[in-house]
């Protein structure tokens, strides 16, 4: 499983987004491109071009660039702006070239049907990771289609950055997550739309780069004591990335953390006996189940459904994750129709839309015809029916 704090990240852009959300004037309903010249932090000027997503009352803008990155431009820093018709997306190779230019020397590009894998690992490792990601991509779409929520096809390649070693990974990750880079082993960043991680097992550095077979690389990796953590991290973060790129969630929309993390933990469960280390969606996530059984907390269900704060508290985050997994597991197994209706509601939330505890409670009640507190006892009874650890 992922490291204890693998997904507990207080993103540095969270406060900025909250500030912008308070004063949103309009969300773009039709694709519109914009070119903005704004004052740069160093006193010069910066040019930003891309798709306009949100405009705030004070003139601040949320723009998505051609490399899929979101940029917030303060209204009082904007010098000029020009509207234009939507540009064609970058070709995969050009997107890859521009992404590689941002990474340290030695990174290479592996292109698959849906992914751009930027890596300084062996080719075999990259191919193993790519095969796992493509398997997840297919399974993700199939699962939600069967749930009654057909998703949008990915319009653009999804970018994944894989470092071979932890030291280089931490140096790069520090720019996104600060000091948390030392305690997490991978993350999906909504602002860059990228997954960043590294070879948790440490085995790839010992591989001969001429070993280009995904099967050979996977066999070595999955025999590692840390294989479960490697697979769970990659699947967990890739699930987030898929959710925010297929219409299940919109980037920077107020999707409750319990939903996004609950879905990711629902998908992440490794199966190390398989060639890729993962196969089944919705298997019992044993570490999460064991934790929620030991530390089920009355009232926490209501708090995670109406607020994200438990996930930001280091003393409570792990238990909150376990409760999120258990709740999603219960709803997905026993209340599928209402669960699909609830996810449909959340998919319609726009970037930086209004959010509050009351709105979250109303949304939950509208879908499930009960309050979060009413779910505790049915959830506990269901968890008691699941088999104990072997």
Regions found by a protein language model. Name each.
Residues 31-34, 157, 325:
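Short, surface-exposed beta-edge/turn micro-motifs
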Residues 90, 175-179, 281:
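Short intrinsically disordered coil segments
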